[in-house]
Amino acid sequence: LIEQGGYPPLAFGFSQGYFYIKANSDRKWLTDKTDRCNVNPDKAEIMKPVTSTYKASTIAYKMPFDSFPKDCWITFRVDIDWTLYGKEKETILKPGLLDVIMSYQQAGKEVKKHIVNKEEILIGRNDEEGYYFKFGIYRVGNSTIPVLYNLAGYEEHEKSSGK
């Protein structure tokens, strides 16, 4: 038996004419590819999860690609409380929380948008080892649209108990 087949617990992406933020949850203790759940950014309502037997996939935010700021640095401040799972019982003990602020310069002025406002959400895996950060470009289907992005200034911090 091999554990495999999960989608990332948190993904920022571009697809079907949208920029989106997606949260995925898997409460199964040992998961495989037989139970797949992946919400479609084009068809999904914001904060309405698509679910399967053990998994949930939720679009926390989306905006049309035409409205997304371009040719500038964009800073995302992301605060996450991961969902707490019941290990072998495959239950959800406490839902997670997601908060995202997007900021950038436009016409010489600072723009700051609170795009996901402390939303209760299912996010994470039933895995006591925790999570790690990874980024990359994943092409969907036969897309040949040129993409360029940079990552700089990435930081992780423990949330203070006063938040």
Where are these regions (language model features)?
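Acidic/polar loop patches that form or flank catalytic/metal-binding clefts of enzymes
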Residues: E88
